[in-house]
Amino acid sequence: MKRIGAHVSASGGVSNAPLNAAKIGADAFALFVKNQRQWSAKPLENQEIENFKQNLKISKILPEHILAHDSYLINLGHPNLQNRQKSLETFIDEINRCEILGIRLLNFHPGSHLKLISEQECLKNIAESINKALANTNRVKLVIENTAGQGSNLGYHFDQIAFIIKNVSDKSRIGVCIDTCHAFAGGYDFRTKAAYEKTMSEFDAKIGYKFLSGMHLNDTKNELGIRKDRHESLGKGFLGLESFENIMNDKNIDEIPMILETIDETIWPDEIKILRNLIKGN
């Protein structure tokens, strides 16, 4: 079964996120477990933790269908050791917040070399940071999101993600999230059945469907291979609805959170319905 939702607001407290997801007809959602533009935050209060769990029950969304997103500040591949350590500490804090809330998946952008070190050295830094994070936490799966390759961000090519996974010690706690806008920006096409099958065959060969733990379903304002991150509403960008029809009818993709990050949140309920209607037999 396809589990579809959006990256909903946790404004006023994380406990609001499940209710915000329910309002749009979602059976999955993403959220930030703290302010994504600050390095640190006060600990979660016991009442807020309890409210989150209660509201999750009210929403009827299962914990495994939540894809938390880490802070935009974190750079696990940072060229500077001190800055990389700062990122790692914040990353570990966010993993622990997920653990406390009962969230099983934390999505993150791999990292950036900032044009100060080689791509290979940066990828090694990322893998090393992940290993340290895993060694200092429990249970939560760390989900690598492919990037658009904008600037010096890595993770836009399946080979780069495969290298990171190869160098992670505990592969039971590592996963991948495919962002369709980012993938298209990185040169991966979804628009026809043949193009989709080629892209996903390459993903399976280089990474493996077994690591696919979530998806971000976004159309794009840019053409194929431009390496710019510009989201668009479903069907209004260069990917078009056929791309999403191919995804929604892929039987290899089931029971993972499929998250909208499209630009107009007022139409998320409609976009969720569109995605469900694309499934053949519905």
Swiss-Prot record:
Listed PANTHER family: APURINIC-APYRIMIDINIC ENDONUCLEASE (PTHR21445:SF0), ENDONUCLEASE IV ENDODEOXYRIBONUCLEASE IV (PTHR21445)
Protein name: Probable endonuclease 4
Family: Belongs to the AP endonuclease 2 family.
Cited InterPro entries: AP_endonuc_2 (IPR001719), AP_endonuc_F2_Zn_BS (IPR018246), Xyl_isomerase-like_sf (IPR036237), Xyl_isomerase-like_TIM-brl (IPR013022)
Keywords of this entry: DNA damage, DNA repair, Endonuclease, Hydrolase, Metal-binding, Nuclease, Zinc
Gene that encodes the chain: nfo
Molecular function GO terms recorded: deoxyribonuclease IV (phage-T4-induced) activity; DNA binding; DNA-(apurinic or apyrimidinic site) endonuclease activity; phosphoric diester hydrolase activity; zinc ion binding
Pfam families assigned: AP_endonuc_2
Record bears the keyword Zinc: yes
Residues that hold Zn(2+) 1 according to the record: 69, 109, 145
Catalytic activity: Endonucleolytic cleavage to 5'-phosphooligonucleotide end-products
EC number, UniProt record: 3.1.21.2
